[in-house]
């Protein structure tokens, strides 16, 4: 940048003293120092912002790399699952086809009787319909209290008076 040694700075100070005079020199020096400080702060802010942007850019690239790796893993898993599912379906269909042929050779006329015996037991495994009343009764009491309509409505002043300690209440006078 600037190559200012001690001798050059002393020369600039002497010239400034001669040109500006002793009355205005301190004020000009303060102003110059303040401007120099502002310039340094501005440069430091710019440096910090540039370094933050560089870090953010590095984080963005790491994020995209991670997302692409996750997508690759996901597609690999899905492909493997589809492949195994296809193999299982092919095996299942070949086994069911063999059962249907055997049942057809035995003289069955309907396709309903050719179904495997385990299909009849699926009705027992079907999920039962849930009772609506049981679900309604499962709500906590505090929730029921908070959501129901209020039957005893009080004004704000009455509510404050109701919950105010006895020591803070005004004494009541009866005439």
From Swiss-Prot:
GO CC terms of this entry: TAT protein transport complex
Organism of this sequence: Burkholderia lata (strain ATCC 17760 / DSM 23089 / LMG 22485 / NCIMB 9086 / R18194 / 383)
Transmembrane segments: 1-21
Cited PANTHER family: SEC-INDEPENDENT PROTEIN TRANSLOCASE PROTEIN TATA, CHLOROPLASTIC
Gene3D superfamilies: 1.20.5.3310
GO molecular function, one term: protein transmembrane transporter activity
Subcellular location per the Swiss-Prot or TrEMBL entry: Cell inner membrane
Family: Belongs to the TatB family.
Membrane topology: Single-pass membrane protein
This protein's UniProt keywords: Cell inner membrane, Cell membrane, Membrane, Protein transport, Translocation, Transmembrane, Transmembrane helix, Transport
Claim: Protein transport is one of the keywords in the record: yes
Stored InterPro entries: TatA/B/E, TatB
Region listing for Disordered, in residue ranges: 155-175
Main location: membrane
UniProt function note: Part of the twin-arginine translocation (Tat) system that transports large folded proteins containing a characteristic twin-arginine motif in their signal peptide across membranes. Together with TatC, TatB is part of a receptor directly interacting with Tat signal peptides. TatB may form an oligomeric binding site that transiently accommodates folded Tat precursor proteins before their translocation.
Pfam families named among the record's database cross-references: TatA_B_E
Oligomer status and interactors: The Tat system comprises two distinct complexes: a TatABC complex, containing multiple copies of TatA, TatB and TatC subunits, and a separate TatA complex, containing only TatA subunits. Substrates initially bind to the TatABC complex, which probably triggers association of the separate TatA complex to form the active translocon.
GO biological process, one term: protein transport by the Tat complex
Protein name: Sec-independent protein translocase protein TatB
